């Protein structure tokens, strides 16, 4: 299998993580156990996941002209990701995610900052790179008109797209049509498409269900791929790891095989702290799959 060329158009954030035993209710103050800042953002996370798994990855995004922005760009470059399409925005803060981590679960508030400047005009400067991609990954932490523009462009140029519709937001009908694959989690799928997505949409859906695995449709027949049982430390980046790994594996076999590979990568990712901290290499995923019976 040739090394895939993957372009990620999406968010780049600094994750500000507070670890606590108790989640405060309204008006309550509780003591936290620890505080950490770690690189994140759904776009950047998926880019790192794909790069760790051996893909050639380009990130298209924006950061603030601030200390966080410099750290975030350097972090991507350190992972081998092409960053000449990540440019700072003057007089704007970098995107930030405030994460409350408790009992190995998480709650997240995202402040978009420079991610709001990932506009169609900005991305249009990289159309040549988009057209040369094997897979383009998108999420919904950047302006929705940009997502719709990229999906339309890629559909016209026969480039495979994976749209991770998180956080769940409505897009024009044409955007869903233009996407090759749509990868919501169970809650996002229900919010966006209801209990019974139409037949055309079902063929695109790769629905993640946490510990219950992944569900998709093949020739209108429901297929369920079980998850791998592990003891999680931090689930923050599991979905992003899944999406990056799914994009990497798409060119090497069936959708079911790509989902199983992505499930294995996600299982490994939750065993370390931080969205990117536990993202595995291709060798680690292959070794894990062998241990699990191939």
UniProtKB/Swiss-Prot annotation:
Pfam hit, one: PfkB
One Gene Ontology cellular component: cytosol
Regulation: Activated by a monovalent cation that binds near, but not in, the active site. The most likely occupant of the site in vivo is potassium. Ion binding induces a conformational change that may alter substrate affinity.
One MF annotation (Gene Ontology) recorded for this entry: metal ion binding
Claim: Zinc-finger is one of the keywords in the record: no
GO BP, sorted A to Z: D-ribose catabolic process
Active site: 240
Pathway: Carbohydrate metabolism; D-ribose degradation; D-ribose 5-phosphate from beta-D-ribopyranose: step 2/2
Compartment list: Cytoplasm
Gene3D superfamilies, A to Z: 3.40.1190.20
Family per record: Belongs to the carbohydrate kinase PfkB family. Ribokinase subfamily.
Oligomer and partners: Homodimer.
Protein name in the entry: Ribokinase
Name of the gene encoding the protein in the UniProt record: rbsK
């Amino acid at each position: 299998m040739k090394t895939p060329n993957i372009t990620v158009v999406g968010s780049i954030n600094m994750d500000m993580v507070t670890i606590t035993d108790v989640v405060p209710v309204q008006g309550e103050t509780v003591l936290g156990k620890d505080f950490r800042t770690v690189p994140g953002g759904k776009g950047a996370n998926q880019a790192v996941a794909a790069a760790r798994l051996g893909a050639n990855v380009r990130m298209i995004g924006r950061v603030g002209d601030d200390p966080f922005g410099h750290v975030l760009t350097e972090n991507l470059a350190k992972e081998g990701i092409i960053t000449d399409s990540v440019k700072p925005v003057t007089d704007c803060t970098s995107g930030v995610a405030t994460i409350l981590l408790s009992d190995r679960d998480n709650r997240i508030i995202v402040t978009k900052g420079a991610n709001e400047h990932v506009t169609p005009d900005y991305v249009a400067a990289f159309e040549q790179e988009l057209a040369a991609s094997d897979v383009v990954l998108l999420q919904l932490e950047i302006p929705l008109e940009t997502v719709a523009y990229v999906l339309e462009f890629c559909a016209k140029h026969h480039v495979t797209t994976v749209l991770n519709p998180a956080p769940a937001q409505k897009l024009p009908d044409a955007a869903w049509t233009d996407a090759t694959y749509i990868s919501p989690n169970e809650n996002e799928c229900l919010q966006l498409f209801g209990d019974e997505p139409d037949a055309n949409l079902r063929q695109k859906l790769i629905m993640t269900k946490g510990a219950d695995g992944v569900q998709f449709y093949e020739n209108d027949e429901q297929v369920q791929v079980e998850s791998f049982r592990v003891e999680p430390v931090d689930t923050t980046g599991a979905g992003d790891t899944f999406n990056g790994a799914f994009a990497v594996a798409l060119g090497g076999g069936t959708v079911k095989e790509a989902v199983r590979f992505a499930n294995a990568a996600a299982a490994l990712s939750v065993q370390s702290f931080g969205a990117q901290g536990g993202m595995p290499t291709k060798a680690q995923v292959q070794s894990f799959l062998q241990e699990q019976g191939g």
